[in-house]
């Protein structure tokens, strides 16, 4: 089932994006400054007390050229119906209840999903007290908030979290590998999903999200349990969704966040385009295990150098995914589909690998002897010791005399030495420097 999804809807200019940015906090920042690794201000992850959830700013999606407010709101409501466990409707305390608010509240009431009404721009006590008219919308208690000042959001989130579906015990099992299949439209995600599941003799069940359309599909193969994340996301949508690039990116981002290993699917017939790089960049930035799948490989004319040339192209276009294995398959003919799950197992194992501290420090010491650390104005970097902080992805901390002396190239050198000594295929390796205390 993955993390709960909260959709923010409302008519234009009520402050949806301001509240969205408040909820996701610093996660909107771009982690790495390299091509293909960007973050749209459309979708993010929020936290409140012990709860973590996805947030969708439906106002960030433009469906067509129409300026008709009601049409735009209807699209927002449809998106919320498809995606959300809980819907936050934003209204404006300064304008009061409008006809558009009334119409939107009726749409949302028909979804049958929990709706929390937030009355924004209630920036002072008088405005916070004067919201009783909003009870007329029939959405229960209105919560006065100020997105610009951060006021009232705690009470609103407390109500939102009350409606989250209970977490399935199956979701918590460490031995289950969660896999998502992502890519732009028409690369063959649905066919690949069916090809993978079609090879399985034991499909345990289809577990539907309690209040949303997304379906995770558990299955087993050779005594290993898997969950294919959000297979409902592969279904054909209406034209408005199929033609909306941002929608497919948002869908991919949510699947990535809920996964251990991500299969990035490329259409071998069409080659690589900018949207491929954007979607793959999200998988890298999220720190998930990554396998690049070139689909429809049976449909192109080949010579003995074709695969080599395509591999070189992938390595050039996806420089930040140089650790990701590449598989050439055909979902339609099932060619090499049998190689996918064994590779998923290898990547998942690497993604959760721990290196003993003593072994890690021996490796780092040897690396610094072979290539001494850099110096700046007579002061040389000294790595005192190293430790592995976390897994998924493997993250290492180097305690040093002065973090400012650590150059990116030397950090990459240490990463390469770690990769040479241990099999970290398919997983990013994070290295952080801290000042030794």
Curated annotation (Swiss-Prot):
Quaternary data: Associates with the 50S ribosomal subunit.
Record's protein name: GTPase Der
Task performed by this protein: GTPase that plays an essential role in the late steps of ribosome biogenesis.
Domain EngA-type G intervals: 4-168, 177-352
Domain of life (superkingdom): Bacteria
GO biological process entries: ribosome biogenesis
Cited Pfam families: KH_dom-like (PF14714), MMR_HSR1 (PF01926)
Name of encoding gene: der
Residue stretches making up the KH-like domain: 353-437
Residues annotated to bind GTP 1: 10-17, 57-61, 120-123
Organism of this sequence: Brevibacillus brevis (strain 47 / JCM 6285 / NBRC 100599)
